């Protein structure tokens, strides 16, 4: 077992309290403008923007610092078409057979169905995989810990980074998602966590009229 090695926390920045309050409010005001979008433009997005946002996600905390995620960025039209075809096949079964009535009723205000044109229209599909274990070149395996929690945190940071860059996003989770590992050639140690669709919203994009819970409903101070 290796001994831990530490270094000074030189990256930390201390701000005056007034500036901290200002920064927190400005960040809040920006983040609450974020909306899930299903109508995307095919307008190109520079690859560097996507790379920077993924690097932000890659800086997320994780269980034992194992960083159990892999971001597969899909730009190729043929691959996007394959993903759309497979996703719509699963979604058709979901809406017609698999989903219980309560789930369909919960989805109704969002106006969703089995048709997923955004999977081909948006310039980028970021397919996020969760790694249950890592594998070295010699075949030895290392178990990962708190995988869902770690990948969830990284995904949230990615969504926020993309919003900060001026892009819209959609989290898409067709069920089941085994086809993604097959299409994208990922290992048996990985499972698809979700598809993050990103790009510019179309000029005609609309979002559902829905409400978030109040601060008091989701927060308790002791």
Where are these predicted regions, by residue range?
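N-terminal accessory segments that position/regulate proteins before the catalytic core
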Residues: 1-37, 41-51, 85, 93, ...
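Short alpha-helical scaffolding segments that buttress acidic/His motifs in well-ordered protein cores
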Residues: 31, 53-57, 196
């Amino acid at each position: 077992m290796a001994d831990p090695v530490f270094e000074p926390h030189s990256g930390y920045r201390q701000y005056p309290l007034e500036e901290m309050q200002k920064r927190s409010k400005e960040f809040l005001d920006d983040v609450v403008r974020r909306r899930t979008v299903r109508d995307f433009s095919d307008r190109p997005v520079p690859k560097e923007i996507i790379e920077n946002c993924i690097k932000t996600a890659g800086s997320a905390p994780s269980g034992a610092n194992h960083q159990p995620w892999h971001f597969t960025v899909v730009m190729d039209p043929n691959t996007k078409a394959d993903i759309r075809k497979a996703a719509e096949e699963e979604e058709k079964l979901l809406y017609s057979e698999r989903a219980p009535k309560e789930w369909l009723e919960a989805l109704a205000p969002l106006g969703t169905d089995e048709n997923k044109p955004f999977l081909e229209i948006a310039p980028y599909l970021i397919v996020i995989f969760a790694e249950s274990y890592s594998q070295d070149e010699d075949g030895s395996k290392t178990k990962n810990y708190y995988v869902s929690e770690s990948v969830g945190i990284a995904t949230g940071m990615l969504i926020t980074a993309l919003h900060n860059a001026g892009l819209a996003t959609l989290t898409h989770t067709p069920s089941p998602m085994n086809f993604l590992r097959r299409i994208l050639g990922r290992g048996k140690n990985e499972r698809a966590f979700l598809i993050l669709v990103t790009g510019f919203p179309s000029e005609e994009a609309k979002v559902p009229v829905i409400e978030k819970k109040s601060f008091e409903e989701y927060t308790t101070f002791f």
